[in-house]
Each structure stands twice: as C-alpha cells, then as structure tokens.
Amino acid sequence: MMKRALTGIQASGKQHLGNYLGVMQSLIELQEQCQLFVFVADLHSITVDFQPQALKQNNFDLVRTLLAVGLDPQKACLFLQSDLLEHSMMGYLMMVQSNLGELQRMTQFKAKKAEQTRNPNGTLNIPTGLLTYPALMAGDILLYQPDIVPVGNDQKQHLELTRDLAQRIQKKFKLKLRLPQFVQNKDTNRIMDLFDPTKKMSKSSKNQNGVIYLDDPKEVVVKKIRQATTDSFNKIRFAPKTQPGVTNMLTILKALLKEPVNQSLTNQLGNDLEAYFSTKSYLDLKNALTEATVNLLVNIQRKREQISREQVFNCLQAGKNQAQATARTTLALFYDGFGLGSQNIK
C-alpha cells in the first residue's frame, strides 16, 4: 500500500529560495512516491495579528506558486485548512488532551512570549493562539493519519508533541492511530542567508540582500549573489564551521542542479562540486549559482503568470472535497472513541 504524507505551509508573504529548496522541492518528489496531502495553513496564520485582504492574497499567491513549481493536483491533494471545519474540531480535541505545562514549554512559544509586552494590569499581551498552536498542528496531522510528515528543525518539538498526544489517546480511548514518522531533507533543511550565512534565510531578515525571493528579477538575483558573503580562504569546499558562506552557496547550487532546467549546467559541473571548483575562484562559484538560480526562477515566474484565479479556486475546491472524505472518516473515529455526537446515544 502506498504511504501517506502530509505537510502544511503558511502563506505568510512572498516565498523565497529557502522555502523552495527546504519544502517545495521535496513535495514534487513525494507526490510521485506517496499519497500526498498539502494544505495552506491559514488557520495558523491568524494566531498572530493579520489583515484579511493580505491573508486572501497570500493564500492565492502560495497556491499559485505551488502549482507553478510542479505540484500536480492529479497526484497531490492541495487545499485550504480553513475550508475544512474538521481541522478546528480536531485541534480542539488535541487541546483538551494536552496540558498547559507541555504547551508552555514549546521553544517557539517561549521565544515569542519573551517578545511580548504587558498590559497596564500586568497581564501578558500575548495571543492565546500562540499557546494552542501546537495542539492545532497535532490535530492537522492526526486528522489524515499520515505515515510521513516532512518537517524543519523549528517544528520538530511540535511534532514530538503530536506523537505524545497520539500515544496518550491510544492508551486512554483505545483508538488505533498511526504514529507519523518525521523526515527532514538534511541537505536543504537549512538554507542560510547569503549576507549572514550564520542565520537561516528568512523574509524577516534585516538585510534583504541575503534573501532570494521566487519573484526576484534576474538583475536582482545577480546583485544579491554577487554580494554574497565569502571569506579569505580562497578555497571552495563544504566547511560549515569555517566557511559558512561558501558552504551555503555550494549547498544551494547542489540542490538547484537537481532541476531539469539546469541539466546542461549539471553536465558541465558534474557530480563533485568540490572537485570542479578546486581550481576556480569565488566569482566562478557565484556565476554558476547565479545561472542555476535564474534558470529556476524564470521558469517558475513564467508558469505562475499562466495560472488564473479560476484555476486556483477549482484546484482548491477539488482538494477540499478529496481531503474532506479522509478528514470526516478520521473525525468520526475520534467521536466514537471520545463518546461525542448524538450517534453515540442510540
């Protein structure tokens, strides 16, 4: 039987190269190997302050980008989290099975809590949604009973909580649940900032020259890569501790060479990048990285422009219907186990 995989992506603004290589590229591979569910996590987006118009546009832009990079609605189920009320219900069921202590010890919550101010009466001015976020995530996952959940390091603790909750529910309510396995793409899990390669590439970076966005035009990509941080070793090799900037560029280039649009460049550089660049300069590395990046982005941008709002809507409606069939089956299982619903009074 084909394994089932699930991932959720927040539509929090423009997508960058780190998003593509860290998540999207692996989804294109997974849709060929698994029954893949991909949802836009818009319920998670509203756990912090948000603007409705921006949320709607971000949702549209993300779905259009996912389709442009190669996610195929015939092979993967793509949908909006908020289109299925089952997500909210499962999130609530997970919340009542969790306890305050385990939610408060989540690293992301503690970090965001430290950034918050206090109200005049001394209470913390922090949205409750930030605290219950991991419970909703656990509900998202268990609703589809996946075998595989691709994750980044920043979500690993939340996913460990999901497994804990699943085991707790299995023991207490005698439900048979799949315990999902969490997988990471070790090569591209942490694409770093080009300007400051000690930090992960992020749209919140203070210096935007270190972030390559999927809608960046060629001249902007050329400028950003040309200004990328290197070092004084003048040696091109994978050395994360001593040469983080060069290592980051090699990592990105290696991942980009998997793309069909870079086949000719792959033939030129070969499989051993350290060997190829052993007699080359940092400028040669930057030129190769620029070519590979521009090839990818031009292809994505061209395809994005061809995707209409109607296509996005139709894709999401089809995905909603497909996802709902699975979600309702799972939620019915939980209702029976918990003793919820009028059907349990017959």
Swiss-Prot record:
Pfam families: tRNA-synt_1b
UniProt superkingdom: Bacteria
Chain span(s) of sequence motif 'KMSKS' region: 200-204
Database matches in SUPFAM superfamilies: Nucleotidylyl transferase
EC assignment: 6.1.1.2
Protein's recorded name: Tryptophan--tRNA ligase
Broadest EC class assigned to this enzyme: ligase
Residues bound to ATP: 10-12, 18-19, 152-154, 191, 200-204
Motif window: 'HIGH' region: 11-19
Family recorded in the similarity comment: Belongs to the class-I aminoacyl-tRNA synthetase family.
Organism name: Mycoplasma pneumoniae (strain ATCC 29342 / M129 / Subtype 1) (Mycoplasmoides pneumoniae)
Quaternary structure note: Homodimer.
GO cellular component: cytosol
Molecular function (Gene Ontology), one example: ATP binding
Cellular compartments annotated: Cytoplasm
Function summary: Catalyzes the attachment of tryptophan to tRNA(Trp).
Keywords: Aminoacyl-tRNA synthetase, ATP-binding, Cytoplasm, Ligase, Nucleotide-binding, Protein biosynthesis
Binding site for L-tryptophan: 140
UniProt catalytic activity: tRNA(Trp) + L-tryptophan + ATP = L-tryptophyl-tRNA(Trp) + AMP + diphosphate + H(+)
